[in-house]
UniProtKB/Swiss-Prot annotation:
Protein's organism: Salmonella typhi
Lineage per the UniProt record: Bacteria, Pseudomonadati, Pseudomonadota, Gammaproteobacteria, Enterobacterales
Gene behind the chain: znuC
UniProt subcellular location: Cell inner membrane
UniProt GO BP: response to zinc ion
Signal peptide: none
NCBIfam families, sorted: PRK09544.1
Protein name (Swiss-Prot/TrEMBL): Zinc import ATP-binding protein ZnuC
Length: 251
C-alpha cells in the first residue's frame, strides 16, 4: 500500500526547545491513525508538520503528489455579533460551489442545519459542519484535531460512526488527534502516544463484548469506543527528561 504521507525521524525545535524528536509515522489510504498525548506533548506541532505548515529541522517527509487534505480544527472562533448561517460560513471557503454545500452537509447528516446560525450550534453540530467543510475539498487525507472536544459520549459515538463511514466511502487516510489518553475510536488501525517523541504505539483493545463496557456505553457505544492500553518503558520528569521504568512499564 502506497503511503499518502510518511515521516521518518522528524525533529522540530523552536529556539532551544526540542518539541518533536525522531518521530516517524505513515498515513495510508483507508487507514485511521489516532494520536494521543498530554497537553504540550507536541501533537499540534506534529499536525502542522503533516499539513506542511511547519518544516522539520531534521528527518524526511514524503507526500503523494497533489495531495488533497481536509482539515477540521480543534476550535472555531467566531464573532458572536456577526450574523452568519451555516450556508454562508461554508461559502467562505475558497473555490466552493453553491451546489456542493447541501450535499456535503447531508453526507454528515447535517443538511437540516444549512440555514441555522453558526453561533447557535451545539458542539456536535459544529463538528459536523466543520467536517462538511473539510469534505468540500474531496480529501485523500482527513486531519481531525480533537474532533470530540466538547461533545458528550453519545455525540462521540455518532461522530466515530460517521468518520468510519467516510473513511470507507472515500478510501481516505484519517489522522485524528485525541485529548483522551485511553478512550479512543475502536476502529482505529494504529494509536501513537506522543510526548515529544513516540512513547508507544499499538491498536485499541477490543472491549465491545465486555458486559461492563456495554452496560456503561450501550451496544452501539461499545462497538465504536475502544481502550488503548499504554506500554511505556519510561516516564517523563517535570523537566521533560526521560526516566526509564523498572519492570514491564505498562500504564
Amino acid at each position: 500500500m502506497t503511503s499518502l504521507v510518511s515521516l521518518e525521524n522528524v525533529s522540530v525545535s523552536f529556539g532551544q526547545r526540542r518539541v518533536l524528536s525522531d518521530v516517524s509515522l505513515e498515513l495510508s489510504p483507508g487507514k485511521i491513525l489516532t494520536l494521543l498525548g498530554p497537553n504540550g506533548a507536541g501533537k499540534s506541532t506534529l499536525v502542522r508538520v503533516v499539513l506542511g505548515l511547519v518544516a522539520p529541522d531534521e528527518g524526511v517527509i514524503k507526500r503523494n503528489g497533489q495531495l488533497r487534505i481536509g482539515y477540521v480544527p480543534q476550535k472555531l472562533y467566531l464573532d458572536t455579533t456577526l450574523p452568519l448561517t451555516v450556508n454562508r460560513f461554508l461559502r467562505l471557503r475558497p473555490c466552493t460551489q453553491k451546489t456542493d454545500i447541501l450535499p456535503a452537509l447531508k453526507r454528515v447528516q447535517a443538511g437540516h442545519l444549512i440555514d441555522a446560525p453558526m453561533q447557535k450550534l451545539s458542539g456536535g453540530e459544529t463538528q459536523r459542519v466543520l467536517l462538511a467543510r473539510a469534505l468540500l475539498n474531496r480529501p485523500q487525507l482527513l486531519v481531525l484535531d480533537e474532533p470530540t472536544q466538547g461533545v458528550d459520549v453519545n455525540g462521540q459515538v455518532a461522530l466515530y460512526d460517521l468518520i468510519d463511514q467516510l473513511r470507507r466511502e472515500l478510501d481516505c487516510a484519517v489522522l485524528m488527534v485525541s485529548h483522551d489518553l485511553h478512550l479512543v475510536m475502536a476502529k482505529t488501525d494504529e494509536v501513537l502516544c506522543l510526548n515529544h517523541h513516540i512513547c508507544c504505539s499499538g491498536a485499541p483493545e477490543v472491549v465491545s463484548m465486555h458486559p461492563e463496557f456495554i452496560s456503561m456505553f450501550g451496544p452501539r457505544g461499545a462497538e465504536q469506543l475502544g481502550i488503548y492500553r499504554h506500554h511505556h518503558n519510561h516516564r517523563h520528569d517535570l523537566q521533560g527528561r526521560i526516566v526509564l521504568r523498572r519492570g514491564n512499564g505498562h500504564s
